[in-house]
């Protein structure tokens, strides 16, 4: 359910070092489909940039520049295994057909360092904009960023959607608590897709 130019192995990393820089990766689909998420493999090759925000962005065109989706306050995430992708779920369903571009808009000049496959050349599909003009990448290779399509990106687990069940508070652990940015959940429960709501309390 994904499209890829890379082979899943990063030999290097690719990044832009300009505040407000944009990176766009061109894909083309022949039939109408629903974009659900974007997989990105960020490589920690230099400094930790997991607190650097970017706008996850989808374009339908770069000339003229037409943004059809943008999701703010995203940060690079380093997965705990070699060459593993992190899935950025879209907040809304996005129906696409034909040519589109996925990528990001930076909010700082820090290089985010996406994994770069040097064995497959997709430079003709990769564009960047650091000074107001979109340019084609001149570096041979493929960034490790993939669009995910379909009705759902989660496998069916055989649970009736009307079935209810109770998770005891001892079934999971949330840490760290408190936190101002990221948190993690570990659970022994067989149901691994959860909904997290927001509760604001003022004293």
Predicted regions, residues:
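Aromatic- and Gly/Pro-enriched, solvent-exposed loop/edge beta-strand patches characteristic
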Residues: 48-124
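Contiguous beta-strand segments within globular domains
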Residues: 22-24, 33-39, 180-184
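Short beta-strands within extracellular/lumenal beta-sheet-rich domains
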Residues: 16-29, 85-86
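Short, surface-exposed beta-strand/loop patches at domain edges
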Residues: 105-156
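A short beta-strand element within beta-rich, extracytoplasmic domains
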Residues: 33-46, 104
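C-terminal outer-membrane/trafficking sorting elements
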Residues: 54-60, 163-203
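Boundary/junction segments of secreted and surface-exposed precursor proteins
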Residues: 1-15, 156-162
């Amino acid at each position: 359910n994904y499209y890829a130019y890379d082979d899943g192995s990063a030999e290097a990393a690719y990044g832009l070092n300009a505040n407000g820089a944009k990176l766009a990766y061109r894909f083309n689909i022949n039939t109408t489909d629903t974009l659900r998420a974007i997989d990105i493999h960020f490589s920690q090759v230099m400094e930790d940039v997991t607190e650097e925000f970017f706008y996850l962005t989808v374009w339908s065109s770069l000339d003229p520049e037409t943004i059809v989706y943008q999701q703010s306050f995203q940060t690079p995430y380093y997965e705990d295994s070699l060459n593993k992708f992190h899935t950025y779920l879209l907040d809304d369903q996005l129906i696409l057909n034909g040519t589109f571009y996925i990528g990001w808009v930076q909010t700082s000049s820090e290089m985010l360092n996406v994994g770069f496959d040097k064995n497959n050349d997709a430079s003709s599909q990769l564009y960047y904009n650091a000074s107001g003009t979109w340019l084609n990448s001149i570096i041979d290779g493929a960034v490790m960023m993939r669009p995910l399509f379909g009705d759902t990106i989660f496998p069916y687990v055989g649970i009736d959607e009307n079935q209810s069940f109770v998770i005891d508070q001892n079934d999971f652990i949330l840490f760290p608590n408190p936190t101002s940015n990221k948190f993690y959940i570990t659970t022994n429960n067989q149901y691994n897709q959860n909904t997290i709501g927001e509760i604001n309390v003022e004293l």
